[in-house]
Each structure stands twice: as structure tokens, then as C-alpha cells.
From Swiss-Prot:
<dbReference type="GO" id="GO:0005634">
    <property type="term" value="C:nucleus"/>
</dbReference>
<feature type="region of interest" description="Disordered">
    <location>
        <begin position="148"/>
        <end position="186"/>
    </location>
</feature>
<keyword id="KW-0805">Transcription regulation</keyword>
<feature type="compositionally biased region" description="Polar residues">
    <location>
        <begin position="148"/>
        <end position="163"/>
    </location>
</feature>
<feature type="compositionally biased region" description="Polar residues">
    <location>
        <begin position="177"/>
        <end position="186"/>
    </location>
</feature>
<dbReference type="GO" id="GO:0045892">
    <property type="term" value="P:negative regulation of DNA-templated transcription"/>
</dbReference>
<keyword id="KW-0804">Transcription</keyword>
<protein>
    <recommendedName>
        <fullName>Histone deacetylase complex subunit SAP25</fullName>
    </recommendedName>
</protein>
<feature type="region of interest" description="Disordered">
    <location>
        <begin position="1"/>
        <end position="25"/>
    </location>
</feature>
<comment type="function">
    <text>Involved in the transcriptional repression mediated by the mSIN3A but not the N-CoR corepressor complex.</text>
</comment>
<comment type="subunit">
    <text>May be a component of the mSIN3A corepressor complex. Interacts with SIN3A and HDAC2.</text>
</comment>
<keyword id="KW-0678">Repressor</keyword>
<dbReference type="GO" id="GO:0005737">
    <property type="term" value="C:cytoplasm"/>
</dbReference>
<keyword id="KW-0963">Cytoplasm</keyword>
<keyword id="KW-0539">Nucleus</keyword>
<dbReference type="Pfam" id="PF15476">
    <property type="entry name" value="SAP25"/>
</dbReference>
<dbReference type="InterPro" id="IPR029163">
    <property type="entry name" value="SAP25"/>
</dbReference>
Amino acid sequence: MSPLPLRDPSHQANAGPRLVEPSCGPGVSLSNRTLCHPSWPMYDNWGRSPTTSERPEEEQVVSKDTGVPVRNYEDVFLLDPLLPCGQRVPLILTKPPQQAMDSRKLLLPPPIMSPSVHPSSSQACSSTWLSEAEMIALAGLLQMSQGEQTPNCVASSLPSTSCPDPVSVSEDPGPSGDQSCSGTDT
């Protein structure tokens, strides 16, 4: 057996640019990001205007404005690369297939999740503010669940009605080690 030559002397380089037609053969794609769908050949054939010799007599002439010829619901599907080969994900259409297609573009059903906020009709959630005692209790529970300070520090760290001005709070700790208001006795 003789080794093959590295360069075929009869091969001539193509002088001009080559146009690549869209093809859906196995492993062929328009770019590295274009996936081929098994229904594309049907759409490509529909997009080309057939001559009278190629068209059977019993087939009706369909205008391009009527949509892509989808015969039944099984013709509209999606492929999932994680599923076994050949398994399809059916696309549930709300309209008959002939009405769901428009100018070679599949009209998908409306999304399940809406971008608009639906107002709540229940009155269970009120927008009233918590009282000071409720805030202290809630802050204490949160800090206890995180294993932080004692509840005495929680009460002094929150602004209270007896010490409304944060400037009047002294920086040196009181007898119990907590901060105290300058105008109050501890």
C-alpha cells in the first residue's frame, strides 16, 4: 500500500468566494450557534415556489400568506438535547395548526407567567407599621436566633421615646455595660 500524497497535484484552488446554501443535513449548520430542526426541510420546500411539473395535480396550491403547511398537532414540536434521540417535546397549540402559523413564523402561545403584577384581593396582608414594643420583640427574636447580644442591648440599640435624640446618647457604658441616655438614670 502506497502512502497518500500530502497535496493532490490535480486539485485547483477555488478562485472566488463560495456561497453556502442553508442545509439541514446531519451535522450541517449555518453557523456554530445554529441548530437544525427536523421540520426545516419542510419549511424550506414550502418557501420555494414549485413549478407545475414538480407539483402533483391533487395537491392544492396554497398561498404563502396562509402559513406553513402543518398537517396536525404532531408536526409542531421542540427537541430537547437531554432527551433520548428521536423523542419530541410537543408544543401545545391553543389554535388549530393552520391558524397558529403566520408568514413562516410560528406564533407561540402566550407565556405562562405574566410580566404584570396581579393585585391581591385578600386583606390578610396589611401595610400598618409595627409598634415600638413589637419592633423590640422582633429584633430580639432575630438576634437570639443568630446567637448575638442579649435582649437588654436590643432595647437600648433601638430608638425609644425616652431617648429620641441620638446625639444625647453617651459613648461611655453605664453601670450595667449598656449605653444609657444622658438625661436618664440607670
